[in-house]
């Protein structure tokens, strides 16, 4: 039944070829009914939100990457010389680095529990828990807003499809209310259907691309934080072994 209706509608489009319809954005906007305009406005808001999240996450991840590249060798050198205070100071100077945030938590916890030259297993365990908590917090910070990209990518096509349905309905209403069945009778409804479908895809595709890209970045950051935590715990264990000798 739907195939027959669409075939009939396409046949009507080629009748009365003298009708002139503009397909520029302004003309199509004026041809839309308010329900379809509302759909386009919603998609525009979703697009703006997605772009804002993309820019925010791109800036945050780039800053984290750049500062971490400077932080890692500097803090490694300080710890090699046994200068924990200096290592903490270096970490605090690189506050946008995901590695610095995790390492700072571990070093501060280690320093707070070290009341003597001897390093106990409890101190190492407390430092490990601090590292795990910090890594979880940083992971949540890195992921902030990214899930909304997935939501936009999955729902925008359906929002556009809703506008398409409204456009088709408007097209048939135009046919029913017009004396002729030519292009002019259905142009407004068809333009609504085309615009909202295209807008939904236009919003969804970049959001899905960005979500996959940022998810890969977060996974990479998680691996780096896990490796840094393990290396720091190994450092504490080695330092504990040297203290017992």
Stretch-by-stretch model annotation:
Residues 65-159, 170-182, 209-245:
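Predominantly long cytosolic amphipathic alpha-helical stalk/bundle segments
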Residues 12-33, 142-217:
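Helix-termination/interfacial motifs at the ends of transmembrane alpha-helices
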Residues 46, 52-53, 188, 218-220:
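Residue-level recognition of hydrophobic positions within alpha-helical transmembrane segments
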Residues 48-55, 61, 81, 165-168, ...:
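Alpha-helical transmembrane segments of polytopic integral membrane proteins
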Residues 41-45, 96, 162:
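Amphipathic, non-membrane alpha-helical segments in soluble helical-bundle scaffolds
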Residues 40, 53, 59-60, 148, ...:
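Hydrophobic side chains within alpha-helical segments
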Residues 2-73:
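Hydrophobic membrane-targeting segments
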Residues 1-5, 242-245:
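Terminal intrinsically disordered, low-complexity tails
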């Amino acid at each position: 039944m739907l195939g027959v209706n669409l075939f009939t509608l396409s046949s009507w489009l080629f009748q009365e070829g003298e009708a002139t319809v503009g397909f520029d954005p302004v003309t199509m906007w004026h041809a839309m009914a308010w329900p379809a305009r509302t759909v386009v406005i919603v998609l525009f808001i979703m697009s703006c939100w997605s772009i804002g999240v993309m820019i925010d996450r791109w800036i945050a991840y780039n800053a984290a990457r750049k500062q971490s590249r400077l932080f890692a060798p500097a803090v490694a050198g300080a710890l090699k010389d046994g200068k924990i205070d200096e290592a903490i100071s270096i970490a605090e100077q690189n506050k946008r680095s995901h590695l610095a945030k995790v390492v700072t938590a571990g070093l501060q916890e280690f320093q707070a529990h070290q009341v003597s030259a001897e390093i106990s297993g409890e101190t190492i365990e407390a430092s490990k828990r601090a590292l795990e908590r910090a890594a979880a917090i940083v992971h949540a910070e890195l992921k902030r807003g990214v899930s909304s990209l997935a939501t936009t990518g999955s729902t925008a096509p359906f929002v556009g499809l809703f506008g398409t349905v409204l456009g088709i309905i408007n097209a048939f209403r135009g046919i029913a209310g017009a004396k002729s069945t030519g292009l002019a009778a259905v142009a407004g409804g068809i333009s609504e259907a085309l615009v909202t479908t295209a807008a939904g895809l236009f919003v969804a595709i970049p959001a899905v691309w960005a979500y996959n890209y940022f998810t890969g970045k977060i996974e990479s950051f998680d691996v780096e934080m896990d490796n840094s935590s393990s290396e720091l715990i190994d450092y504490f264990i080695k330092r504990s072994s040297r203290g017992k000798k």
